[in-house]
Amino acid sequence: MRQDPPAEVPDTLFADPAAEARWRGRFTAARISVPNWARDAPSHSVYSSNASGTWEVYAWDRDADTHRQVTDRPQGTRGAALSVDGAAIWWFDDTDGDEFGVWVSEPFAGPGAGPAPAVPGADRGYPAGLDLGTTTTAIGWSTDDGSTLAVDVGGSGLRTLYQHTEDAGIGALSRDETLLAVSHSEHGDARHPAIRVLRVPDGSSVGDRHDTPRADGQGRGLTPIAFAPVAGDQRLLVGHERRGRDELLIWDLASDTETELVIDLPGDLTADFYPDASALLVGHTRAGRTTMHRYDLASGVLTDLPTAPGSVGGSDVRPDGSVEYGWSSATSPPLVRVLRPDGRDEALLTPPGDRPAPSVVLDDAWVPGEEGDVHALWARPEGTSGPVPTVFMIHGGPQAADEDRYSAVRAVWLDAGFAVVHVNYRGSSGYGSAWRDAIEGRPGTTELADIAVVHEWAVSSDLADPAACVLEGWSWGGYLTLLGLGLQPELWAVGCAGVPVADYLAAYADEMEPLRAFDRSLFGGSPTEVPEVYRRASPITHVAAVRAPVLVLAGENDPRCPIRQVDNYLDALAAGGKEYAILRYDAGHGSLVVAETLRHTAAEIAFVRRALGPAPPER
């Protein structure tokens, strides 16, 4: 049994009972995801909520206006789907958050014999896509042996359409269920996938699309989004990056022609069809904010859809043309809203119980960096001026970005008297392909260079106290935290790393196969092929240089950042006489249990307070 120093989890963070209740209430307040509905029975919907204290699946009968909790598992359940007729709810059955399992289904109407395997014959694996038709189920899974994509037509039995050692996934099933678009990386670049469209009856190929790399050698990906939702319509909506950012095209399989959509918006785009396939609902992301638009496919007219400034987390168009979407901003807690065809924008679902307390506005900084300005979002505690202790909260991914959205975690750090800085470093999405791909071949050090220039800005602008700067993050952000503590020890007074990559060679050996494929694409090969790149980018390589106290939080069942490589790093800290603590929990890559998230947050703030000495004033 290991003897690592355990992290202290205090009973309270604040002496003021109102402040204590406020921060906890931001986490325990019920939240609801944007609902999905059955295609042919749109009154039947499912959504996820933490109302029970754990994120679980709920059924919503809109006609009867009734809600029912479907799943009840100790470590929660991630998302669900509905059969086309709305009779069955599908959810992914893994073990304690390990993401390895099978799809199961149960009646929408209520519990009967309990959930049963939804697709007899499907192997246990990591999910690689699901698309449900009237008579056809398209399902994918991955294992250490690679990816398998299969169909079951009319209950005739599972039949493999595609199998490969490289990463692949279900893209989209055509409305007439004769074509299946798949995303694949046979070319060895999982970060920039290609598309193949297969005939469902026999698995033969209708067409392939693989964008060749740009002149600078960097890849260009293609992503199948959706077929037009009209029977006989073989138009496939595709995401591309041919002009250096995420844009859209229509690939008509009937004529094998492409039409790139020229949409006059400066940021990255994603979209889906309106129900009659006449238009697209377009999501536009730029500088950490989201706007929504309607793009008419016949005329090319783009119409802005009115939404408040902030971030949209999921959206879809109902049969009547209403747009349902999730929205929040740094100040305003998340809410599921609906934009009616007549222009009314109102709350669709109000979670039960008290609403979480608001927080403060995020401001923007654009800081000159090595390859362009680095975008940072920041906030300081209300009522403060001059330098204050500052948490550099680093996002995961790396293909993700911090946005102007509500965060209970950010809010409690601000309440505790810390400024918060988010850095959308090179590697982040939302700033164009070149920015996202700048870390290829040099991961870790590239992102840290951007974090360093933002750190310098925060200190020089009298936001951050240079003696009280905290490096904090989860997943890839946790990885960058550990790497930063070793490569930039002069910058950081303390570090908190949640579910991090800590020993890259051991992580590669133990992680799920889709992430190995991602790493090969990111690093330029496997550890056998480019060992020095992995060695240089691995936090354990630089552990001797760590000066700051380190808190690590890790899941025992994490398939993405497995526990063995975390233990290797802790052993290296211990051998070097470094100050550290560990919080272990019985789940995977993060927790769906609200009480566990509260423990993590309390442990981080308590650890940082002890490391920095006298606490800043509470707000």
Q: Which positions does each model-derived feature cover?
A:
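Conserved beta-propeller blade repeats
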Residues: 29-46, 74-92, 103, 115-116, ...
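Beta-propeller blade-edge and WD-like acidic-aromatic loop motif
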Residues: 2-20, 50-69, 94-116, 142-160, ...
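Cap/lid segment of the alpha/beta-hydrolase catalytic domain
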Residues: 350-467, 472-474, 509-517
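Flexible loop/turn segments at secondary-structure boundaries
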Residues: 54-55, 189, 244-246, 268-270, ...
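Structured loop/turn residues at beta-strand edges in well-structured enzyme cores
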Residues: 65, 84, 98, 175, ...
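Active-site-proximal cap/loop segments of hydrolase catalytic domains
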Residues: 425-619
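Short glycine/serine/proline-enriched coil/turn segments at secondary-structure junctions
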Residues: 97-98, 187-190, 217, 356-357, ...
